[in-house]
C-alpha cells in the first residue's frame, strides 16, 4: 500500500531511519540486565554485521512485493524458519527430526505456491527466497551479537545502517519527492514505529535469551498474519494449487516446532 506513491528504496529508507530515531529515548533510559560477553568487535562493525543482512532482507522483500502477492510473499519469506536450523547445524546447533520433516513439507509447499505449470519460478518468488536467506543470516548474527552488545543499541544501529543504505539506492534509482512521502505517510509511520522499531527490537531482546531456532519459530507466525492481511485487506485470493502449498507449508512450520529426537549434532561441535 505504501509503495503506491513512493519507490521501495525510499519507503524502506525513511521507514528504518524513523525506526532508529524512535529508539533514541529508550537508549537513554535503557539499562542492560545481563552482563554482555567480552568481545573485540567494534560497535560500528557489529552494526554492519547485523544491519547489512537486514538491509538485504528488507530490500529484497520490498522489491519482490512488486512482482508477487503479499500472501505468497509472506509464506515464502517464512522459509527462514527452515533455513535457520539447517544453517545452524554448521554453527554447532543440533538438527532435530521434526526440523527435517518440516523442511520437506515446507519445501513441497513452496513448490505448489511458487512453481507455475511450466515449472518456472517468478522473479518476485525468487527475490522472496533470497529475502528469507538474508533474514536467516540476520537471525544468526543477532544470536551472536546480542550476547555481546545491548539489544536496543544493536537495533538502533542496524535500523540506521539499513535506512542509510536504502536512501542511497533511492537517490540513485528513484526520484523521492515530498508529495510521494506525504501520500505514504501513514504506512511509513506504521511500519517505521510498530513493524520496525517495536517488532525488530523485541526480536533482538528476545534473542538474547533464546536460541535462534526457537526465535525463528516464533517469528514464523508473521506468515499467518501476512496471508490473512493479503486476503482481507488487499482482496487477494489463493488458487487450489496455492492453497495446497499453504497447507503443506503450514504443517511443516508447526511440525518443526514440536520437540523431537536429535538427528544430527552440530557439525562444529562434533568436529571439536
What residues fall within each predicted segment?
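Hydrophobic/aromatic residues within transmembrane alpha-helices
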Residues: 2, 11, 15, 64, ...
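Juxtamembrane helix-entry segments on the extracytoplasmic side of multipass membrane proteins
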Residues: 4-13, 38-43, 115-137, 171-190, ...
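Transmembrane alpha-helical segments that form core, pore/gating elements
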Residues: 9, 19-23, 83-86, 90, ...
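Helix-helix packing/entry segments at the starts of transmembrane helices
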Residues: 14, 73-79, 141-163, 196-232
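C-terminal-most transmembrane helix of multi-pass membrane proteins
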Residues: 16, 184-186, 220-272
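C-terminal transmembrane-helix exit sites in multi-pass transporters
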Residues: 22-27, 80-101, 224-243
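Hydrophobic transmembrane alpha-helices of multi-pass small-molecule transport proteins
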Residues: 23, 95-115, 135, 166, ...
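Specific transmembrane alpha-helical segments of multi-pass solute transporters/efflux pumps
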Residues: 24-77, 112, 192-210
